[in-house]
Amino acid sequence: MCCVAPAFARSVDFAIDKPAGHPCPNLGTTPTASPTGTPAGSGTPTGGGFGCGIHTQLRQRGFVGCTVYDCFGAGQKVAQVTFGGRDWRQAPGQAPLMFAAFATMRHLHELLWYLTQARDLPAAAPLHDRLDAAVAETQRLSDLPAGELAGVDVDAHRGSVVPLLRQASELARAKVVGRRTPYQSRSVVGKDLRRVDLRGADLRGASAVGADLRGADLTGADVTGADLRGADLRGADLRGVLFLIQSQLDAARGDAVTRLPAGFSHPAHWTVQRTHPGTDPTRAGHPRSGREAGGRAGRRSGRR
């Protein structure tokens, strides 16, 4: 579903143009030997499979965007639950409805992800009843029949959920020990933030493309929707970061010393060597570590 429904344009993230609703030419192919950097469409068709023929070579073939895309489990639910195991190949007449339902489901599952993370924050205890209600309503919408699901007003529902997530964030960030006036910015593209105190920072929706965050302590920092493409997280401490998703890490750079919350993994393209041999990179720019700041402010919960 994820390789068919969305559209993408040729760019630094994708090697080709692909219209919405059209399968990627690498879908259902097997890899063929080719030089690094060869564009898409060089696989061998396998007769209708759902695997990516260049999955292990996506970055080398110019499909970085595929490696950082996260549907939050929406594709599986639409195929297995909403449409009872049928797919767009088995029921081509329903493909447009499937793709419309998928687009809605992805938004709802993304909201479920953030709501679940907010519900797990101890500091957000005063909001638990409202968060539980928001989870239940979002889940109810995601369980609607295909026709109703595709017609859900996602923007209206998001508008009711986002203020609640912001309140949860504010409560959690206020608990960061030693927090001064928190850093806040919506654009830190390419900036050197190694000496900036980012504990409890508000980086919601920030563009941090190529930002230098080496050794940064992001305890209690809210990174909801932050664009971390190419951001340098080597040696950074993200154990207490708020509202992180794996695809943000996949889009960034890091190393073996980058500290992550439980349940997250170091992307395969990250370096494995220490960035600063003999030092504790999490202390760069300030005198305190994540443990001294009160430990992890939240944890990653299971995907919905």
Where are these regions (language model features)?
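Catalytic cores of enzyme domains
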Residues: 154
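Short, well-ordered alpha-helical segments
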Residues: 130
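Hydrophobic scaffolds flanking metal-cofactor catalytic centers in soluble metalloenzymes
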Residues: 1-122, 126, 134-149, 157-160, ...
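Tandem repeat scaffolds
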Residues: 166, 174-292, 296-304
